[in-house]
Every structure is written in C-alpha cells, then in structure tokens.
C-alpha cells in the first residue's frame, strides 16, 4: 500500500513529542482540530446513523467515539483537539431542541452523560497524551441554561448556583454598544433563557476559580477555550486563567481589534475574530479584496499584545461554513493554508476537511461521521501537508512560532507572506482566482531566499530555483496555494520524499 509522505512525516514527528506541558508557550506550536462531541463520532462507529441538524437533537457522538477516531485527526497533523463543554445540561427538549452543543449547563459538577462517563473523559485525555497530543475543553462561566422565560426561572435547578442571589437581575441585552448591558444583562430569549451569573460577587468568583482548577486537574486538561468572554467583566478573568493553570483562549465575538485585543491583557489568548471577516471576504469569491486581509494581518500584529497566541479560524459552530459561500475547492484550499500558516494557533472545525457546506446554526453542526472519514479527500490532504510543513518548521526553528507573519506582496488576486527566521522561513502564496484560474509565473521579491537557492513547493511537491536577482519565480495555476521551504532543510523529513 502506498503511504502519503505527509502521513509518514507526521507519524514520525508526533510519536517523538516531548513531555506534555500546558503553558501558553507550548500552545503556540499546537494545531487544533475543533469538534462538537455530539457530532464527531459515535461509540458504535456508525457512519450512517441519522443526524438531521434541523432537529437540533442529540445525535450520539461520544468521548469514546473520539478516541476511536484519533488516527483520523492525527493523520491531518493536528496536535490538539478542542471539545465542546462537558458539564451536565438542561435535560428538556426545548422549542430549540436539545442542549447537544453543551452551552446550556445546569450542573457544573456533573458531566453530560450523553457523551459518556468520567472514565471515558479521562480515557480520552490519556489517549491524546499517549500520542503527544493536547486536550482543550470548552468552558462557560457567564451563564447557565433554562428552558423557559427569563422572568420565571426556577433557580433551584442550578448546581451549585441554586438561588437568584448568584445571578444578575433579569434583563435581556438590548444594546451591544453598551458594555454594562453586555456584561450584566442576559443572553438567550424567552424560549431558552441564559441566566447571567454575577461574577462580581466573591462567592460566585471563588466557586468558579475552585471549579476550573478541579476540572483541569481531574481530567488532565491541557487548555481551555472560554465561551462568551466579553459578557463577563474583565477583572474576573486573570484569576480564572490563573486558577486553571493552563493556556486559556477566549471567545470575544467582535471584529474590531481595538475591542478584542485588550482582552489578551486578562487571559492568554483570544480567537482571532478581527481577521475572520477579512479572511473570509478575501477568499469566499473570485472578486474578493486582498487589501483588507493584508492590512488586518499588520493591524493585529501591531495592536494585539501577542498575535502568536491568537486562534486563527474561518469556520466554527457559530458562523456559516466557508463552503456555504462557494463550492470552489481551490478557494477552500487557500483559506485553509492561511489558517495553518498565519501567526497564532490554527483551528480547523470538524467537517471543514470534507468541504461541509452548512450555513448558519444549526445547519453548520453536521455529523462528521456521515462523511465516512475519508483520508483521501482534497482538503484532508491539503490540511495534512500544511500542518506537516508547519510542524517541521517548528521542530527546526525555535523562533518560528514567535516570528510574526510578514505580508511581502499583494495584488488584486494574490497575497504572499513569510514566517520564520532567515534561512528557515516558510513563504506562502495565496490566490483567490479559484479553480479556473490561469497559469502564470509570479516573480516574488522580498522572500528572503538567496540567489540560486532551491526551494520545494510542499503542496504540489515541485521545486523552484531562486533567480539571480533574488526573486522567486512561483508557478501559479488553478488558483492553488503555493508553500515554499528551502529544499536542503527538508533532508530526512519525508516531506515530499525529502525532495
């Protein structure tokens, strides 16, 4: 059986991973596969079990199911997974369906039995650690979940926050420009309300700090993704991050870096929403503009406390799938390459590698098992190749993850960027011409390579030679991304059979 070069490389690199740690510095070099536990894999291994996203019901995904599919995840070069919240949820089937997603918790000291047992969750952590991989768990400190109107909540159902005294007085957020409302009023509506915990109270604050430390310890968790961060006052978060004792990355759902970046002063990292829309808009059509993306790369790099600790993404369970905008596979390849080779920690959402095309929630929460988990799909292979060169560059260049990505070229349809110290840099050229894009040679300056140096394009496994003027003649065709790395540095790596 023929085995792809990237599979051999990734296996060799990851089984040799060093002892696990969970500091922000360690997380810089990770690559995250994000999944909804209920929608990724079932214990019975079924690839045909029905999962109608419109029903918004539990579909049967489990922690054991994830364990059984770690080869599939690791085969793409991912070094970590992020799973949705593990706490016990409201038990009812509401008018909006079940709490299969995990964001309507009612008992923070019990686990969601739909996903499995405490032993199953511990087994998942152990299985990841045996592979040199990390476990990131989603957590919610802002709110609980209630099946009913905000004005008639039975607070006794919440554990341990079993009285109204623990919560902000009921009011729904009316004005998102008013930060006081954003923090003190409630999310949800009168069908499913999300009672808002008053995290300014010491009793609430201390409960959360004790809880998060215990959660991390009990299940050997390596990192946390924190939901609805902007809905909690900033001075709550440093203590929470410290109590967790691991890298914390927060969801601050706002596109303005002037609003989002300061949250990095109160926790380790945030999801890179400022770059999300420029990235999406650059590649969701063949008429997208590279200008906003080029400018936002530089803005985030200069304005955020540390862009190398942000999470880069273009898909998640809250936003429409990239393929819901366009079915052009070349555009999807470019956006995936950007995610993996930009500054920060790459995040690919389960199903993205199979070109899933669900629109707004709940359509974007498809069951991954219905794809059959093919490892020969075009995006699976592209993601594996991009992760492979990133992982390899990190292993060879201690400064790679802290070297800030530098856009070196743009035109109406192209952006090029370099990352890594001189002599070991990756240069990525991205196009939005799409699959019908013409063939041409781009003369690229500013890449930092030397005249006559041979480079390997690691997606297509071809080579190019740097011109006498230092420019790189990059052959472009079919709107595909190009990723360059010095050929001599690949010796022994198995990447492109070491060229």
UniProtKB/Swiss-Prot annotation:
GO cellular component terms given for this protein: extracellular region
Site for Transition state stabilizer, residues: 318
SMART domains named among the record's database cross-references: Aamy (SM00642)
Catalytic activity: Endohydrolysis of (1->4)-alpha-D-glucosidic linkages in polysaccharides containing three or more (1->4)-alpha-linked D-glucose units
Biological processes per GO annotation: carbohydrate catabolic process
Residues the record lists as binding substrate: 56, 104, 143, 225, 230-231, 318, 365
EC annotation from Swiss-Prot or TrEMBL: 3.2.1.1
Subcellular compartments: Secreted
Signal peptide stretch: 1-21
Example of a GO MF term: calcium ion binding
TM helices/strands, residue ranges: none
Record-annotated disulphide pairs: 51-59, 171-185, 261-304, 461-496
Cofactor(s) of this protein: Ca(2+)
Entry's family note: Belongs to the glycosyl hydrolase 13 family.
The name this protein goes by in its record: Alpha-amylase
């Amino acid at each position: 059986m023929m085995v792809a070069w990237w599979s051999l490389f990734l296996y060799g690199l990851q089984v040799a991973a060093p002892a696990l740690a969970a500091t922000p510095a360690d997380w810089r070099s990770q690559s995250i596969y994000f999944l909804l536990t209920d929608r990724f894999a079932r214990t019975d291994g079924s690839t045909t079990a029905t999962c109608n996203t419109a029903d918004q019901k539990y579909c049967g995904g489990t922690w054991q199911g994830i364990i059984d599919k770690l080869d599939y995840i690791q085969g793409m070069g991912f070094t970590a997974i992020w799973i949705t919240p593990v706490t016990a949820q409201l038990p009812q089937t509401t008018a909006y369906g079940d709490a299969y997603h995990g964001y309507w918790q009612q008992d923070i000291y019990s686990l969601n039995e739909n996903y499995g047992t405490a032993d199953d969750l511990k087994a998942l952590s152990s299985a990841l650690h045996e592979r040199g991989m990390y476990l990131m768990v989603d957590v919610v400190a802002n709110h609980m979940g209630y099946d009913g109107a905000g004005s008639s909540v039975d607070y006794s159902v919440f554990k341990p926050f079993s009285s109204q005294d623990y919560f902000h007085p009921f009011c729904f957020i009316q004005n998102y420009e008013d930060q006081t409302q954003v923090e003190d009023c409630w999310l949800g509506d009168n069908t499913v309300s999300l009672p808002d915990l008053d995290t300014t109270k010491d009793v609430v604050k201390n409960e959360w700090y004790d809880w998060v430390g215990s959660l991390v310890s009990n299940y050997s968790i390596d990192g946390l993704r924190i939901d609805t961060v902007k809905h909690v006052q900033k001075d709550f978060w440093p203590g929470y991050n410290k109590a967790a004792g691991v890298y914390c990355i927060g969801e601050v759902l706002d596109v303005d870096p002037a609003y989002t970046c300061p949250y990095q002063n109160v926790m380790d990292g945030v999801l890179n929403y400022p770059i999300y829309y420029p990235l999406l808009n650059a590649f969701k059509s063949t008429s997208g503009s590279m200008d906003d993306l080029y400018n936002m790369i530089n803005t985030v790099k200069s304005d955020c406390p540390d862009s190398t600790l942000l999470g880069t993404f273009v898909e998640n369970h809250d936003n429409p799938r990239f393929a819901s905008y366009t079915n052009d596979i070349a555009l999807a390849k470019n956006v995936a390459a950007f995610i993996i080779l930009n500054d920060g920690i790459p995040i690919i959402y389960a199903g993205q590698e199979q070109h899933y095309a669900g629109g707004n929630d709940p359509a974007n929460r498809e069951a991954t098992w219905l794809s059959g988990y093919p490892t020969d799909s075009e995006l699976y292979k592209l993601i594996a190749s991009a992760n492979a060169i990133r992982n390899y560059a990190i292993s060879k260049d201690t400064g790679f993850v802290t070297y800030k990505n530098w856009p070196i070229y743009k035109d109406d349809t192209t952006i090029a960027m370099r990352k890594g110290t001189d002599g070991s840099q990756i240069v990525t050229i991205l196009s939005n011409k799409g699959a019908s894009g013409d063939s041409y040679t781009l003369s690229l300056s500013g890449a930092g390579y030397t005249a006559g140096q041979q480079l390997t394009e690691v997606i297509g496994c071809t080579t190019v030679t740097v011109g006498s003027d230092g420019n790189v003649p990059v052959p472009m065709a079919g709107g595909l991304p190009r990723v360059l790395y010095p050929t001599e540095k690949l010796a022994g790596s198995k990447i492109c059979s070491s060229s």
